[in-house]
């Protein structure tokens, strides 16, 4: 039997639950720990206003570009990004930069399988923070079983949780696509990580970075994935599916090198005026049973 996750309905239900959450019981990214202020400053919070709540994540990949997933442009208008900030909202640290254009990957979901789930945000002015390194095109930065780190301001309990006030990170092992395809229907532009009980990306971590740490500090980190979709949060044997960043390089590199906005799939918001809290999933995913 196949179980399909219907994303739009789920995200709206979770948004409603979030509004009623007890603010005294706020949780953090599932099974993770606080990332010290001033570290991983390429990890970006996407916001509707400069000081408002972060509703999605992303990664600074050039001084004027943030890479995220299409869910983060669909359910809210990404008017601002917070770069170098430790907190889920406010303006007391980092910088808040205006987004002047959002564009989806030109081949996003062309076959209906959710492939190339990427969105690129162009900033009004350059960030003062250093971008994260992009992976090698030959995919040699990803090896099954290696450790990676996911980051964001999302929940640690599911389905009842609320955003973290401080950025969190959690260490996760990468799966081979062959193994992950025994759990989910995925495509070559995906990479899976996690699947250990109690440790995962979760609601409101959507679009956030999955990185490979090479041991020489943040300047040596490599962006290998972006939080996309999954089945629940932190369930044993159920990893999160990430957008595989190496698959986007042919599209991304010409844009960030020429500093031009390339014609792309139009971005349309599903919710006008106010945003909900996106569920982790970026595309309907099918679970194999």
UniProtKB/Swiss-Prot annotation:
It is found in: Secreted. SMART domains: Tryp_SPc (SM00020). Its main location: secreted. Residues 1-19 form the signal peptide. Pfam families: Trypsin. InterPro entries: Peptidase_S1, Peptidase_S1_PA, Peptidase_S1_PA_chymotrypsin, Peptidase_S1A, Trypsin_dom. GO terms for biological process: proteolysis. Secreted effector that suppresses host plant glucan elicitor-mediated defense responses. Targets host endoglucanases and inhibits the endoglucanase-mediated release of elicitor-active glucan oligosaccharides from P.sojae cell walls. This is Glucanase inhibitor protein 2. It comes from Phytophthora sojae.
